[in-house]
Amino acid sequence: MKLTKILLGALLLGGFTACNDIEQADRYEPIEVTAKKNVLIEDFTGQHCVNCPKAADEIQRMQADSTIGEHVIAVSIHGGSMSKHDSETSGLGLATDEGETYNSRWNVKSWPKGLVDRTGGLQDYESWNASVVSRLAETPKVNITADKVAYDEETRTLKLVTSVSGNADVTG
Protein backbone atom coordinates (compact mmCIF):
# COMPACT_ATOMS: atom_id res chain seq x y z
CA MET A 1 0.00 0.00 0.00
CA LYS A 2 2.83 2.35 0.90
CA LEU A 3 4.60 1.48 -2.37
CA THR A 4 1.42 2.35 -4.32
CA LYS A 5 1.26 5.78 -2.71
CA ILE A 6 4.92 6.41 -3.46
CA LEU A 7 4.51 5.36 -7.10
CA LEU A 8 1.35 7.43 -7.48
CA GLY A 9 3.11 10.45 -5.97
CA ALA A 10 6.09 9.98 -8.29
CA LEU A 11 3.79 9.76 -11.33
CA LEU A 12 1.95 12.92 -10.33
CA LEU A 13 5.21 14.76 -9.72
CA GLY A 14 6.55 13.56 -13.06
CA GLY A 15 3.32 14.64 -14.76
CA PHE A 16 3.69 18.18 -13.48
CA THR A 17 7.23 18.48 -14.77
CA ALA A 18 6.16 17.23 -18.19
CA CYS A 19 3.76 20.12 -18.78
CA ASN A 20 4.76 22.64 -21.39
CA ASP A 21 4.70 26.27 -20.42
CA ILE A 22 2.97 27.95 -23.35
CA GLU A 23 2.86 31.72 -23.36
CA GLN A 24 -0.60 33.32 -23.36
CA ALA A 25 -0.04 34.91 -26.76
CA ASP A 26 0.89 31.54 -28.28
CA ARG A 27 -2.24 29.73 -27.10
CA TYR A 28 -4.58 31.23 -29.65
CA GLU A 29 -4.03 31.26 -33.38
CA PRO A 30 -6.32 33.82 -34.96
CA ILE A 31 -8.02 32.87 -38.20
CA GLU A 32 -7.33 35.38 -40.93
CA VAL A 33 -10.53 36.71 -42.45
CA THR A 34 -10.56 38.28 -45.87
CA ALA A 35 -13.86 40.11 -46.03
CA LYS A 36 -15.66 39.72 -49.32
CA LYS A 37 -18.85 41.49 -48.25
CA ASN A 38 -20.47 43.57 -45.54
CA VAL A 39 -22.52 42.02 -42.75
CA LEU A 40 -25.65 43.50 -41.19
CA ILE A 41 -26.41 43.06 -37.48
CA GLU A 42 -29.96 43.95 -36.47
CA ASP A 43 -29.74 44.51 -32.71
CA PHE A 44 -33.10 44.24 -30.93
CA THR A 45 -32.72 46.44 -27.88
CA GLY A 46 -34.63 48.62 -25.45
CA GLN A 47 -34.19 51.36 -22.88
CA HIS A 48 -35.44 49.10 -20.06
CA CYS A 49 -33.03 46.30 -21.03
CA VAL A 50 -30.21 45.95 -18.49
CA ASN A 51 -28.04 43.66 -20.66
CA CYS A 52 -28.46 45.61 -23.90
CA PRO A 53 -25.41 47.83 -23.25
CA LYS A 54 -23.30 44.64 -23.35
CA ALA A 55 -24.64 43.94 -26.85
CA ALA A 56 -23.84 47.51 -27.89
CA ASP A 57 -20.32 47.06 -26.49
CA GLU A 58 -19.90 43.86 -28.54
CA ILE A 59 -20.95 45.69 -31.71
CA GLN A 60 -18.55 48.53 -30.90
CA ARG A 61 -15.75 46.02 -30.29
CA MET A 62 -16.38 44.33 -33.64
CA GLN A 63 -16.51 47.66 -35.47
CA ALA A 64 -13.20 48.67 -33.86
CA ASP A 65 -11.54 45.41 -34.98
CA SER A 66 -8.99 46.20 -37.70
CA THR A 67 -9.79 43.00 -39.61
CA ILE A 68 -13.59 43.03 -39.75
CA GLY A 69 -14.67 46.42 -38.41
CA GLU A 70 -15.26 48.31 -41.64
CA HIS A 71 -17.49 45.47 -42.87
CA VAL A 72 -19.85 45.36 -39.87
CA ILE A 73 -23.03 47.43 -40.23
CA ALA A 74 -25.24 47.57 -37.14
CA VAL A 75 -28.77 48.82 -36.67
CA SER A 76 -30.39 49.08 -33.24
CA ILE A 77 -34.12 48.38 -33.27
CA HIS A 78 -36.16 49.61 -30.32
CA GLY A 79 -39.49 47.89 -29.80
CA GLY A 80 -41.29 45.45 -27.57
CA SER A 81 -41.75 45.48 -23.82
CA MET A 82 -38.19 46.67 -23.11
CA SER A 83 -38.61 49.87 -25.10
CA LYS A 84 -39.94 53.29 -24.17
CA HIS A 85 -42.23 55.30 -26.42
CA ASP A 86 -42.31 59.10 -26.62
CA SER A 87 -45.66 59.13 -24.80
CA GLU A 88 -44.01 57.44 -21.79
CA THR A 89 -40.91 59.63 -21.62
CA SER A 90 -41.81 63.21 -22.55
CA GLY A 91 -40.35 62.79 -26.02
CA LEU A 92 -37.23 60.83 -25.04
CA GLY A 93 -38.42 57.36 -26.06
CA LEU A 94 -36.58 55.51 -28.81
CA ALA A 95 -39.27 52.96 -29.69
CA THR A 96 -40.90 53.36 -33.09
CA ASP A 97 -43.83 51.75 -34.88
CA GLU A 98 -41.31 50.17 -37.25
CA GLY A 99 -39.37 48.78 -34.27
CA GLU A 100 -42.57 47.25 -32.91
CA THR A 101 -43.25 45.69 -36.33
CA TYR A 102 -39.75 44.19 -36.51
CA ASN A 103 -39.99 42.84 -32.95
CA SER A 104 -43.33 41.28 -33.76
CA ARG A 105 -42.13 39.87 -37.10
CA TRP A 106 -39.10 38.17 -35.56
CA ASN A 107 -41.02 37.17 -32.41
CA VAL A 108 -38.48 38.72 -30.03
CA LYS A 109 -39.29 37.60 -26.49
CA SER A 110 -36.04 38.47 -24.67
CA TRP A 111 -33.42 41.16 -25.11
CA PRO A 112 -30.81 41.71 -26.33
CA LYS A 113 -31.17 39.55 -29.42
CA GLY A 114 -29.92 40.03 -32.93
CA LEU A 115 -30.00 38.85 -36.49
CA VAL A 116 -26.76 38.52 -38.43
CA ASP A 117 -27.50 38.93 -42.14
CA ARG A 118 -30.91 37.45 -41.32
CA THR A 119 -29.44 33.96 -41.24
CA GLY A 120 -29.57 31.52 -38.36
CA GLY A 121 -32.49 33.21 -36.61
CA LEU A 122 -32.31 35.28 -33.44
CA GLN A 123 -29.00 35.03 -31.60
CA ASP A 124 -27.59 36.16 -28.27
CA TYR A 125 -24.91 38.84 -28.58
CA GLU A 126 -22.22 36.39 -27.48
CA SER A 127 -22.71 34.52 -30.79
CA TRP A 128 -22.59 37.53 -33.10
CA ASN A 129 -18.83 37.65 -33.63
CA ALA A 130 -18.61 34.03 -34.80
CA SER A 131 -21.58 34.53 -37.11
CA VAL A 132 -20.08 37.73 -38.53
CA VAL A 133 -16.71 36.08 -39.22
CA SER A 134 -18.48 33.15 -40.90
CA ARG A 135 -20.59 35.44 -43.09
CA LEU A 136 -17.59 37.61 -44.04
CA ALA A 137 -15.80 34.57 -45.45
CA GLU A 138 -18.65 33.86 -47.88
CA THR A 139 -18.56 35.14 -51.44
CA PRO A 140 -21.65 37.23 -52.16
CA LYS A 141 -23.85 36.23 -55.10
CA VAL A 142 -23.82 39.83 -56.32
CA ASN A 143 -21.74 42.95 -55.81
CA ILE A 144 -23.75 46.11 -55.23
CA THR A 145 -21.93 49.42 -55.51
CA ALA A 146 -23.36 52.83 -54.62
CA ASP A 147 -22.19 55.00 -57.49
CA LYS A 148 -23.96 58.21 -56.55
CA VAL A 149 -25.59 59.16 -53.25
CA ALA A 150 -27.56 62.35 -52.66
CA TYR A 151 -29.54 63.17 -49.52
CA ASP A 152 -31.81 66.19 -49.27
CA GLU A 153 -32.19 67.08 -45.58
CA GLU A 154 -35.09 69.43 -46.18
CA THR A 155 -37.29 66.83 -47.88
CA ARG A 156 -35.59 63.85 -46.19
CA THR A 157 -35.20 62.26 -49.62
CA LEU A 158 -32.39 59.88 -50.53
CA LYS A 159 -31.42 59.37 -54.16
CA LEU A 160 -29.15 56.45 -54.82
CA VAL A 161 -27.66 55.21 -58.08
CA THR A 162 -26.26 51.70 -57.88
CA SER A 163 -24.55 49.19 -60.10
CA VAL A 164 -24.92 45.45 -59.66
CA SER A 165 -22.67 42.69 -60.97
CA GLY A 166 -23.14 38.97 -60.49
CA ASN A 167 -20.61 36.58 -58.96
CA ALA A 168 -22.68 33.44 -59.45
CA ASP A 169 -25.51 32.18 -61.62
CA VAL A 170 -28.85 32.64 -59.92
CA THR A 171 -32.04 30.90 -60.95
CA GLY A 172 -35.59 31.58 -59.90
Model segments located where?
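Bacterial Sec-dependent N-terminal signal peptides
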Residues: 3-40, 50
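Non-globular targeting/processing and membrane-anchoring segments
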Residues: 18-31, 133-172
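Structural recognition of the beta-strand scaffold that forms the well-ordered cores
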Residues: 40-43, 73-78, 112-117
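Conserved redox-active cysteine motifs that mediate thiol-disulfide chemistry
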Residues: 44-58
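Sec-exported extracytoplasmic/periplasmic mature domains
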Residues: 54, 60-68, 119
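Thiol-based oxidoreductase modules, predominantly thioredoxin-like and allied folds used
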Residues: 68-97
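Non-catalytic, surface beta->alpha helical segment in thiol-disulfide oxidoreductase systems
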Residues: 101, 108-143
